Amino acid sequence: MTLAADGVAQLRGEFPALQRLEGGRTLAFLDGPGGTQVPRRVIDEVSDYYLSSNANSGGAFATSDASDRIVVEARAAVADLLGADTPDEVKFGANMTSLTFHVSRSIAATLRPGDEILVTGLDHEANVSPWLAVAKDRGLTVRTVGPRLDDCTLDLDDFDAKLSPRTRLVAFGWASNAVGTINPVAELVRRAHEAGALTYVDAVHWAPHGQIDVRQIDTDFLVCSAYKFFGPHVGILYGRAEVLERLPAYKVRPAHDRFETGTLNFEGIAGTHAAIDYLADIGRRFGATQGSKRVQGAFMDRRLALRAGMTAIREYEMGLYRRLAEGIAALPGARLWGINDPDRFSERTPTAALTLAGMSPRAAATALGRIGIATWDGDFYAQGLIERLGLSEEGGVLRLGIVHYNTESEIDRLLAALEDLARGGVARAAAG
């Protein structure tokens, strides 16, 4: 059994927000790259924390013990999701951006003027601006690897040209939140390590779409955000144990953890654990087979279940994306940015960046929103890429993001609406 329409219908029943009506129709959430909806179990865990366990950590009483236990158990769940060696390599924070500013400061304290940091022109600013800030403070040099504009992939020749013996850290994304390009993560890590550099991978956009194994890709750091994979607003940092141990930490003196500042978001962390268990349950219910036997059932190891679940999600989502891409290709005046060759769809996520002739992305998103279809428009903090594509003055792109709770009928509904907008935009452009 794989994830298909009937299974998705069952899963959709676990998401209260997916039952919301707009104009007599359910709201179609095609805004996943900006944040996902959450299943009931996540809501219940957040609520239950306030109802029965609301206390700070470290106390000698039951509710404080419960808060401590929530964090310990959630670290283990995240370690399973990311493939970490130990839960101690998992750190929680307000969001990926805050965690990256924190870690960038710690790493920069070990560097000297003239040392170099490599970033990319495909990335979200949260994995660019922190490195620019510490470079300014410390007299470091930041080099930017450019994208190939024909397919919005990373220019690997430029990567090699800018990687040098002076490079101390390479920061890049697993996948582009703007156009969906998947980078060759393990290969980039290998090249960076051969040059003697640390690696810092932004997996925020990738996390809801496929497997993560920090040991397999061999990265030193990886960050993601639970609200992108059906959880609350919690930032997550993986750091290789031996690297974390040698970094200076910026913290209050009595704090026992070196990279978690202040009181943690216990309710959000409880919800994050629930979101990971939800993904593991997808693996148990709809996961792939191993050899001749199905790896399925209540007793499946969580790490194995997560791999099976993310594999099932990836296969289902990309089936929907093919349907969407084929439909967009037939629209008059429409342009899909990024990898468009169906034979290369394995190199992308199910996120479409679109422009329509004669209509701004904001106008298109507004029109879709009025008929109950949620999308995003703009640059999504991937300013460098949108500028290089020459789309900033036009308002960026219209972004359509598929996740596993979306359906074929929602894709068809979206395509019908886009066709109306495209034909109207072409007519306006011709008249103008």
Describe each model-derived feature in a short phrase.
Residues 1-432:
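Pyridoxal 5′-phosphate
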